[in-house]
Every structure is written in structure tokens, then in C-alpha cells.
Amino acid sequence: MAFETEIETKRRELNYLKHVSALTQKLKAQLDELSVQVAQMNSNAVTVKDVMANWDSVLRSISQASISLLQYTENDYETGKWASKEEHRNQQGAEDESAASESSEDNQQRQQDQLPPLPETLVRVKVADDVE
């Protein structure tokens, strides 16, 4: 009788160990799947970082380009501020140079310099939390 109870105890212990082994295998499979998902998240995070770096570069370029918009104001277009700058440069150049005949290219350049510059194109970029 003691022998049968010992066999029954060992069977219960064996069943318990089989159950623990099955749970361990499930846990191992879930951890492997989690590892794959974490690796994918890491890859996606690197991709997002690259995209954000590209957008940062684009925004910096737009910012630098918009600085050139500040060169002339609307009032400058009305008064022709660029023409007075060009005339001042031409007068200094005429004093420095000897009296030589002007070529047709110089005349064309001078005429183009007297025309008002075209305004820059305005670009609107949605940056963050921009409410429409």
C-alpha cells in the first residue's frame, strides 16, 4: 500500500512537471514573438528618426529661404529701394573705371537692375498642432 501511494505521488508530480513544461514552452514562444516585435519596433523607430531628420532639414531650408523674403518690404517695392542701391554702385564703378564704351550686355544688365525684383513665393508648411 505504501508502494501504491508513492507511485500515485510520483504520477501527480510527473503530471505537474508536464504542465510546468507546457507552460514554459508557451512562455518561450511568447517571448520569442515579443523579441521579434521589439526588433520590428526598433527598426520602425529608426525609420521614424530618419524621416523626422529629413523633415527637420526641409524646415531649416524653408526657414533659410524665408529669410530672403525679409530683404525687401512692401514699401521697398513702392519706392524702388533697389534702384537707388544700383545707382550708387554704378556711380562708384564709374568713378573707379576709365571712360570706356559700354557694351550692350552692360546696358541690358543695368535695365534689369532697375526693374523691381519679383516677390518670393509664399510657402505654408503645417508644422505641429496647426489648427485649421
UniProtKB/Swiss-Prot annotation:
<keyword id="KW-0158">Chromosome</keyword>
<dbReference type="GO" id="GO:0008608">
    <property type="term" value="P:attachment of spindle microtubules to kinetochore"/>
</dbReference>
<feature type="region of interest" description="Disordered">
    <location>
        <begin position="81"/>
        <end position="132"/>
    </location>
</feature>
<dbReference type="GO" id="GO:0005737">
    <property type="term" value="C:cytoplasm"/>
</dbReference>
<protein>
    <recommendedName>
        <fullName>DASH complex subunit DAD2</fullName>
    </recommendedName>
</protein>
<dbReference type="GO" id="GO:0042729">
    <property type="term" value="C:DASH complex"/>
</dbReference>
<keyword id="KW-0137">Centromere</keyword>
<dbReference type="InterPro" id="IPR013963">
    <property type="entry name" value="DASH_Dad2"/>
</dbReference>
<dbReference type="GO" id="GO:0005874">
    <property type="term" value="C:microtubule"/>
</dbReference>
<keyword id="KW-0175">Coiled coil</keyword>
<keyword id="KW-0963">Cytoplasm</keyword>
<keyword id="KW-0206">Cytoskeleton</keyword>
<keyword id="KW-0498">Mitosis</keyword>
<keyword id="KW-0159">Chromosome partition</keyword>
<feature type="compositionally biased region" description="Acidic residues">
    <location>
        <begin position="94"/>
        <end position="105"/>
    </location>
</feature>
<keyword id="KW-0493">Microtubule</keyword>
<keyword id="KW-0132">Cell division</keyword>
<keyword id="KW-0539">Nucleus</keyword>
<dbReference type="GO" id="GO:0044732">
    <property type="term" value="C:mitotic spindle pole body"/>
</dbReference>
<feature type="coiled-coil region">
    <location>
        <begin position="21"/>
        <end position="50"/>
    </location>
</feature>
<dbReference type="GO" id="GO:1990758">
    <property type="term" value="P:mitotic sister chromatid biorientation"/>
</dbReference>
<keyword id="KW-0995">Kinetochore</keyword>
<dbReference type="GO" id="GO:1990023">
    <property type="term" value="C:mitotic spindle midzone"/>
</dbReference>
<keyword id="KW-0131">Cell cycle</keyword>
<comment type="function">
    <text>Component of the DASH complex that connects microtubules with kinetochores and couples microtubule depolymerisation to chromosome movement; it is involved in retrieving kinetochores to the spindle poles before their re-orientation on the spindle in early mitosis and allows microtubule depolymerization to pull chromosomes apart and resist detachment during anaphase.</text>
</comment>
<dbReference type="GO" id="GO:1990976">
    <property type="term" value="P:protein transport along microtubule to mitotic spindle pole body"/>
</dbReference>
<dbReference type="GO" id="GO:0051301">
    <property type="term" value="P:cell division"/>
</dbReference>
<comment type="similarity">
    <text>Belongs to the DASH complex DAD2 family.</text>
</comment>
<comment type="subunit">
    <text>Component of the DASH complex consisting of ASK1, DAD1, DAD2, DAD3, DAD4, DAM1, DUO1, HSK3, SPC19 and SPC34, with a stoichiometry of one copy of each subunit per complex. Multiple DASH complexes oligomerize to form a ring that encircles spindle microtubules and organizes the rod-like NDC80 complexes of the outer kinetochore. DASH complex oligomerization strengthens microtubule attachments. On cytoplasmic microtubules, DASH complexes appear to form patches instead of rings.</text>
</comment>
<dbReference type="Pfam" id="PF08654">
    <property type="entry name" value="DASH_Dad2"/>
</dbReference>
